[in-house]
Swiss-Prot record:
PANTHER family named among the record's database cross-references: TRNA (GUANINE-N(7)-)-METHYLTRANSFERASE NON-CATALYTIC SUBUNIT WDR4, WD40 REPEAT PROTEIN 4
Gene: wuho
Location of the protein in the cell: Nucleus; Cytoplasm
Name the record gives this protein: tRNA (guanine-N(7)-)-methyltransferase non-catalytic subunit wuho
Pathway: tRNA modification; N(7)-methylguanine-tRNA biosynthesis
Biological source species: Drosophila mojavensis
Alphabetical keyword list: Cytoplasm, Developmental protein, Differentiation, Nucleus, Oogenesis, Repeat, Spermatogenesis, tRNA processing, WD repeat
Extra remark: Wuho means 'no progeny' in Chinese.
HAMAP family: TRM82 (MF_03056)
Gene Ontology CC annotation, any one: male germ cell nucleus
Length: 383
């Protein structure tokens, strides 16, 4: 899985077993993290079954690959999860080299990752819908099961006041859970008709949440009441969301990656004017969609960094957010230098068609059988 995001002043790009921390202006690499091919060499403990044999899900013979990467709000910690040997790795961020603090086994592959606003713990959701809390101070402490969904969780955010954890899943639900009393659900934000793939809180506007979905909508919610505030139709199902504040508490740029559409990315300016929210401006960025498999993107003040695959090799391209054209100020040689770090690793984008609900039409089959039965009865009466 390819992860890319921007946290000032660094662009973070992850694929395979490597994470790069890049200057977005000249693409010079600040530092990197390379996860060992065998995590047992850095403290990973393989859990044993009742018979004393190692669990296959954590076997050392499986290829290790990074799934999710996250920076702590105080910029002191970096968390990442792996598949193959399923683990949560916690690093101390330093100017030159990140220092590994802990390696903790996960029961199942992760689906989303988020730090607490005070950087004291990290939340990991897995593909069965469970959400665990891992302490970042007492790194040997066992994880706490906080909440669970009945389907895979695609995104998770923790409100700045530490009072609510918000999760979204494949079954089109957005759940607002009280914290620390996570057995108590505060509210649901219901209305999406397909998977909810991304969430974002609006800085400076307490109680407001952005969501995107496979039902081709972007929605603004009051998550405290569960009420929808605004709905914006999209040209295609939405799978990734990035946000940037343009004017403090009043104007935001929302960037959405589309699934299987001629235009790869949509840019929407959300504005508060006369106590009402509206989409003041919208534009589409083609990003050469169709000529390569786009998997993720990051948004900076003036550029869009798009990651994808060409001939099963990781490819990074840069576009201007103002006009959607390829950024000529970024020399191709600089991009090649970044991509060379992943040259030995294949890049096969995730099949996002699996995110959509499988619908079975039993009625049509029943009606067809009934029709044939009536025709057979009529033929018998005619005889």
């Amino acid at each position: 899985m390819t992860t890319i995001f921007y946290t000032e002043p660094e662009l973070v790009l992850s694929h395979g077993r490597k994470v790069l921390f890049i200057n977005p202006n000249d693409l010079q690499i600040f530092k990197d993290i390379e996860v060992p091919a065998d995590l047992t060499t850095c403290g990973f403990k393989i859990e044993a079954t009742d018979e004393g044999e190692p669990k296959a899900t954590c076997g050392s013979n499986l290829e290790v690959s990074i799934l999710n990467v996250c920076y702590s709000p105080d910029r002191q910690l970096i968390a990442l999860t792996t598949v193959g040997q399923k683990a949560l790795l916690l690093y101390k961020s330093r100017p030159e080299h990140a220092l590994l603090l802990s390696v903790r086994a996960l029961a199942r592959a992760s689906s989303a990752l988020a730090f607490a606003p005070d950087s004291s713990s990290v939340l990991v959701t897995d593909k069965t819908g469970d959400c665990y809390q891992y302490d970042c101070v007492e790194v040997e402490a066992p994880p706490k099961l906080l909440l669970g969904h009945l389907s895979i969780v695609y995104d998770i955010v923790w409100t700045p006041d530490l009072k609510h954890i918000i999760t979204c899943d494949r079954d089109d639900k957005i759940r607002v859970t009280n914290y620390p009393a996570t057995h108590d659900i505060h509210s649901y934000c219901l209305g999406h008709k397909e998977f909810v793939s991304g969430l974002a809180l609006l800085p400076g506007n307490e109680g407001l949440l952005i969501s995107i979905s496979g039902d081709k909508t972007l929605r603004l919610w009051n998550y405290l009441t569960g009420k929808e505030v605004l709905q914006q139709q999209l040209p295609a199902p939405a799978v990734r969301l990035q946000m940037r504040e343009l004017i403090q508490s009043k104007r935001y740029l929302l960037a959405v990656l589309f699934y299987d559409h001629v235009e790869a990315i949509g840019l929407y300016e959300l504005e508060l004017k006369e106590a009402a929210w509206s989409i003041a401006k919208e534009s589409l960025v083609r990003a050469e969609a169709g000529s390569w498999s786009i998997s993720n993107f990051a948004l900076t003040s003036d550029r869009i960094y798009v990651a994808g695959a060409v001939n099963e090799r990781l490819t990074l391209r840069v576009y201007n957010s103002a006009d959607g054209k390829q950024a000529e100020s970024v020399p191709a040689g600089w991009l090649d230098m970044v991509m060379e770090n992943f040259a030995e690793q294949t890049c096969v984008p995730e099949d996002l068609s699996a995110w959509f609900k499988k619908r079975y039409d039993n009625i049509s089959e029943y009606m067809e059988r009934k029709k044939r039965r009536i025709e057979d009865q009529q033929q018998q009466h005619q005889k």
